[in-house]
Amino acid sequence: MKHFNLVFLPVFLLHTLAFCKTPEKSLQHPSPSEKIEIKTAADQPEVYLPLLSGKKVGLVVNQTSILSSKNNMHLVDYLMMEGVEVVKVFVPEHGFRGDADAGEAVNNEIDKRTGLPIVSLYGNNKKPSAAMLADVDIVVYDLQDVGVRFYTYISTMHYVMEGCAENQKPLLIFDRPNPNGDYIAGPVLKKGFDSFVGMHPIPVVHGLTVGELAGMINGEGWLKNKVKCDITVVPVKDWTRDMAYSLPIKPSPNLPNDTAIRLYPSLCFFEGTDVSLGRGTHFPFQVYGYPDPKYGDFRFTPVSIPGMSKNPPQQNKECYGKDLRNEPLTHRFTLQYLLDAYAVSGKKEKFFNNFFDKLAGTDQLRKDIIAGKSAAEIAASWETDLDAYRDLKAKYTLY
């Protein structure tokens, strides 16, 4: 039985893309005169509206689920305007409006604007149940991802796929560009280190769109009991993975711009330490520091910011560190920031908290840092796994 469909992509092209190994290319920033207007799946209603006609629809969406071609109209509003019978909305971490802090509870509610029930998939309940899907004929997933394993929207997608598969509900995935899709990097997650911030044996920077990753999850049998989800992907039009993509809406409260998104895979490891990565400032994931002058010359003081960062690490303490806001947007993953902070800390094992290994997807990274290995030595140890992943990834590449 076929469980992965690609809307309107010719069959011969699908097979070609599935088995070609595409080399990683440098990120390209076209000049205004040669700028190509891509179309996300949401901006292709001529493709998906016929698939939703006459059906009761459940949506997995948040503030990023917009139609750029309709002045950033939200997908919920657009579908209802077009007469699609939307019956409920499922939401990930950060909630429907994207204003809940990292780790903050997201509650079920009724949306005041539309009257639709909002069902949280973050917290105690992460998978849509049979009861939640009983009045739904088809589910649509449209969340802007950033291409990093510990960004939890792909974990939500995994559970949505699982819930749909277990309850025989088709899933329509609206694809969007991956702003970190031009390369892969970092350790591949090892068995026994899976969690909601890492559910799949993929590298930290995985280089896939959500549509491609859904195909991999399905094809590799990573859902519970190896169930298969009936997936249809609406691909992005006129986008390639070496094409720079600036997100029109910030994907979560603490990724406010392109620089933060490119630095995110490198700096998020500080979440597994007591070093601040700028939560509680207006430039999160663009700086790092600690209340000790030996960490660097740049100074900042994290404070509680409602809707962005409540009670951030090192709150109300002056931190010293590095300002990375002028890093080029071609920036790629590096361990150097983490190693530099570790070196000046003098804390050895106490530098890390229990969350670090979950972010890394292994305990080997922590052990290598403690052993004094360089960034180059550590990265070299990942190459065998990354080569195997490149071969796996090539089977599911759509762009």
Predicted regions and their residues:
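Glycine-rich, aromatic-lined ligand/substrate-binding cores of catalytic
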Residues: 237-312
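Glycine-rich, charge-decorated loop segments at or immediately adjacent to ligand/cofactor-binding or catalytic sites
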Residues: 98-103, 172-194
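Conserved anion/nucleotide-ligand pocket segment
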Residues: 194-264
